[in-house]
Amino acid sequence: MRTPDAQMRAGHIPAHLIPDGTDPRTVVVVHHQAEARDWTGPILLALVAAGGSVGVVMTLCLLLQTAATTATALAAAAPAGVGLSISLKARKGK
């Protein structure tokens, strides 16, 4: 305990802080307590993160639904001749 602050935290009273003529046994050390923590920031951060996650999941679901609808429409239209077909005939001999 080299600093007065460390001595105060340990409950020791540095001699230079006691006024002359005071009985050290009657001195009371009052420790300062930290103020109550403000939880607004962490709670707001958690809500924004949860909302962002829900937004990402909803966007992915919408994208998947659009892709499935497009694939269904293409599969229904393929037998109607929308696709191109190429037939290759190989020549036998000269």
Swiss-Prot record:
Claim: rRNA processing is one of the keywords in the record: no
Keyword Transmembrane: yes
Subcellular compartments: Cell membrane
Keywords: Cell membrane, Membrane, Plasmid, Transmembrane, Transmembrane helix
GO cellular component: a single term: plasma membrane
Membrane topology term: Single-pass membrane protein
Transmembrane segments: 41-68
Function in brief: Involved in plasmid transfer.
Stated name of the protein: Protein SpdA
